[in-house]
Regions:
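Conserved SAM/SAH cofactor-binding pocket of Class I
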Residues: 69-168, 194
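Flexible, glycine-/basic-rich loop-and-beta segments that form/coincide
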Residues: 252-256
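Conserved AdoMet
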Residues: 1-79
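Conserved Class I SAM-dependent methyltransferase catalytic core
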Residues: 186-249
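Solvent-exposed beta-strand sheet faces enriched in polar/charged residues
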Residues: 46-49, 58, 139, 212, ...
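Residue-level signal for inorganic ion chemistry
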Residues: 2, 40, 70, 99, ...
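Conserved beta-strand segments of alpha/beta enzyme cores
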Residues: 56, 111, 135-137, 231-234
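Mobile active-site "lid"/loop adjacent to the S-adenosyl-L-methionine
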Residues: 161-191
């Protein structure tokens, strides 16, 4: 992949010209990229792109690297957005915008809004919406802070949910990613608590709230949803069998 980037050629071309030597400039450029990779820097940051839900997205160190398991959240959301229905959909903590853009791409009639507290992340998200020619409203704010009086028929989120003391934070890709987008407090649930507590004031009655969480957090998430008056709580496993997403429907008496 690094050599493809340096030479601007695909793998088929490289295979057909395997006996040809690259010039000195290309060799130096490749060596620099290889050094970054050797130092552990994620390939997505080196190349500046990552595929998600069949689409290529621009990625910078200002945002998390999209994971395949997050596609489950997109699939569950799409099941709740009828084709050609102008549903009001909100993506909280949008980061690179992959969830919002994928939903807008798959459901062009949906009215998708995305929020993030970080201006740099929103810049990446806006660029990705432009890249894929979709209309998404973007707001900078802390969860619902910029959305006073607005209500939605579906809210989705992939919030920070890693516990502050998790040893994995200093390993592999996580060591290079923005910690504010990963860490959700001492137990990893601070952001989920805030979302669950406040979402009821922004959901239509019966509307769904869906969010990704850690492998061992589904029980705590179900308890939070129940405590705030949501109904029909459910959790879903990813392709590896790990419970990855939980959600529920808002009721008339959701606690504000």
């Amino acid at each position: 992949m690094l050599l493809e980037r340096v030479l601007g050629k695909n793998r088929a071309w490289l295979a057909a010209h395997a006996d040809e030597a690259a010039d000195a400039e290309a060799q130096n450029a490749f060596a620099a990229l290889a050094q970054r990779r050797g130092d552990g820097e994620p390939i997505a940051y080196i190349l500046g792109v990552r595929e998600f839900y069949g689409l290529e997205f621009g990625i910078t160190p200002a945002v998390l690297i999209p994971r395949p398991e997050t596609e489950l959240l997109v699939e569950l959301a799409l099941e709740r957005i009828p084709a050609n229905a102008p549903l009001r959909v909100l993506d909280l903590g949008t980061g690179s915008g992959v969830i919002a853009v994928a939903l807008a791409k798959e459901r062009p009639q949906a009215r998708v809004t995305a929020v993030d507290v970080d201006y740099a992340a929103l810049s990446v998200a806006r660029a990705n919406a432009k890249r894929h020619k979709v209309g998404v409203r973007f707001f900078c704010g802390d969860w619902f802070g910029a959305l006073a009086g607005e209500r939605f028929e579906l809210i989705v989120s992939n919030p920070p949910y890693v516990a502050a003391g998790d040893a994995h934070l200093g390993q592999c890709d996580l060591a290079f990613e923005p910690q504010r987008a990963l860490v959700g407090g001492a137990d990893g649930l601070d952001c989920i608590r805030a979302i669950v507590a406040k979402a009821g004031a922004h959901l239509d009655p019966g509307a769904w709230l869906l969010f990704e969480h850690g492998y061992d957090q589904s029980g705590a998430c179900a308890a939070l949803l129940a405590a705030h008056g949501y109904r029909q709580m459910q959790s879903w496993p990813d392709l590896a069998g790990i419970v990855r997403v939980s959600g529920a429907r808002a009721a008339q008496n959701v606690l504000k």
